[in-house]
Amino acid sequence: MTIHSYSLDNGLNIHIKQDTRAPVVLSQIWYKVGSSYEPKGITGISHMLEHMMFKGTSKYTKEDMNSLVENNGGVQNAFTSFDYTAYYQFWHKKNLELSLSIESSRMSDLQFDDNEFKPEKKVVLEERNLRVDDKAFSFAFEQFMKLAYKDTGRYAPIIGWREDIENYKLEDLKNWYQQHYAPNNANIIIAGDIDPKQSFELVKEYFQDIPRSSIENIQTNEPRFNVGYRYSQIKKSPNETSAVMMGYITPSLTTDYNDNDPYALMILSNILGGADASILQQKIVREDNLCCHIDSEYSPFTKGEDIFVITAIANQDESLESIQDKIESIITNVKQTKVTQTQLDRAKVVIKSDKVFSMDSLETQANLIGSLASIGLDVDYYKYINKLYDVSIEDVHRVLSKYFNKENLTSLHLLKD
């Protein structure tokens, strides 16, 4: 995957991926700040600022931003994560310059209006209601993450705690913007039917005069391994399903641990609960009929430690304690017997096939480049996928033995009330 990378004197990094299959361009800007950077008291401020970024600049009113994109047949949006906040326009390639003009204006001269801020805060509170507070499973998972990431930058949800959202001040937004929205804290990603060199020159034209900012080096505490078993339970409506959530603290590719561990954990996630043929699916869903669904999830592409999550949706009236005991028993058995070569080979093929096929999407290409750049990793995604083939049975056994023990486990049971 050929990626053309450049940088400006003010610290802005640019990554361009040419794809000539259609006359379109996806232009993105990624800021290296997300909810994991936020101190207590203003959790969710990155997400709140994302909303305010569409309220206008000195050059473009909010109506201008919307009409320019819509009238040119494009779409625009944004998203916030633990590690970054990104904005994008997707439209005909002739509009690349307009994308860059909009984003340079937003980076340098966003307008903050209390008359826009107050109603938008209500919008965010309602978004929290719809996505989290009114959904038992989402609310429970939020509490599970809080427990697992206790005393770290990821303890709070991306959208923020309700009481913090209610107490935001406009000055909080201004300060967050001034601290983090600067060229030396951003990556521009351009993917589509464009000329890389010409695209870089356009970026240079619109961004080179924006000054650097003194970015505060925020040190976020990371979760520690083997700090003791953490458990909680939540009761909810009797009409909703019950669930078991389990998580083991594990390293990512950004942490200073054995470089093979994240790749072995990717393989293990697929073998344990990543597909219909996975061990947990076969044992707990099909053979024992304890759950209607179970899966495992792990990503090596995070800033700091990650959590290897196992989620099980219980069948009617099944004991959640029995389900967790069964999962732990299966993990212990896999430790003792090891995975088979067939399981290992199948997982490698499935993971690589899924990733390669997903790269057919322009959005996926750009999002991968942007997320990798934002957490300080090499943007050549295939480099990581190819390393999966080096994972051995012993590597998988090693990570099972190292990380999958009771002292490194957090679990939450979502019970019927």
Residue ranges and their predicted role:
Residues 106, 127, 202-209, 249, ...:
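Generic, well-ordered alpha-helical scaffold segments in large soluble proteins
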Residues 43-57:
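Active-site SXXK
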Residues 370-380, 388:
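C-terminal, helix-dominated tail/subdomain
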Residues 56, 90-121, 275, 300-358:
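M16/insulysin-pitrilysin zinc metalloprotease superfamily fold
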Residues 34-42:
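Short pre-active-site segment immediately N-terminal to the catalytic Zn-binding motif
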Residues 1-35, 59-95, 131-185, 209-255, ...:
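Non-catalytic beta-strand/loop surface segments
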